[in-house]
Amino acid sequence: MYSFCLDNRHSKGFAYIDYSEEKAIATLYQKHNIPFIIDLWNRYYEDHIWGLEELENAQRDMMAYMSVTDYDMNSKEEREQMYLIYKLIAIVSYAIFHQRSLVGSGD
């Protein structure tokens, strides 16, 4: 599982990637060249802090993958990838909205 919080490593996480979503993130990592996903997957079992500039770039990069036309909606695996993109955009956007860095913590 991977948890996200704003700024402080010791604060309670506001969002999580659970074990059931790991397959979707691994597939996105393999299929697409999305720097935030690559960084997240490479640091999945570590703690990491993304600054505002990185988050703004991540938001822009992932927005390109939001359209349902990019996915086969008959495929459960592709729907899960799309939902994870939506979730990650929401997580990143939340941090940007609050103008705070995003701390990820793997366990």
Segments predicted by a language model, with ranges:
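Acidic (Asp/Glu-rich) sequence patches and key acidic residues
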Residues: 1-107
